[in-house]
């Protein structure tokens, strides 16, 4: 029986060395194993949350790139509006020609606003301006991102026409709105970047803690296994000697 127990202990150390984990079953420490499994769940949660936040930054980068193109179009529209304001020199035909380019720019802005998307989700038409990202390991730990609305209606440019009464301030207001949206996107991106760093560091710290609780101390395990194997050998030899002595006593009796 003793020999069996020693052999079992030696086998357990061998399993620890082979697997790298000193927690082979609940018998090795039910409470500690429960803690380790719980922390592993948290580690996986923080890792996934970091990836979610990175996806969120991807969404914001796409939106910001689209706003950059819209800004260039608005700046050109402003140049044309200033040109069209020179009524002392320009004819109605000249202003109509300018309006033709303005209309092309407006159509380009509309196309960007209605077609910019990330994984099939529209980003600048106002339909998905408030999106939720799970940025923490647990329920309720998330962040909402807003990419704004860049449609002509939202920018106040739907009826902008330099052949009629118009105000250059209308384009300045649109530029200010786009600039505000881009500033918001930058702030949200920075927040997500901070979250990625926090999640990554927390995951690393928890991984170290779990490693200390779970990983086998190879040198100690080998030493203990050798001790148990030596005890097993000694016990075997003692049993063999006892059996030999018994046989000798029996021979003397008969």
Regions from the language model: what does each represent?
Residues 32, 109, 145, 235:
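Residue-level signature of catalytic and energy-coupling elements of molecular machines
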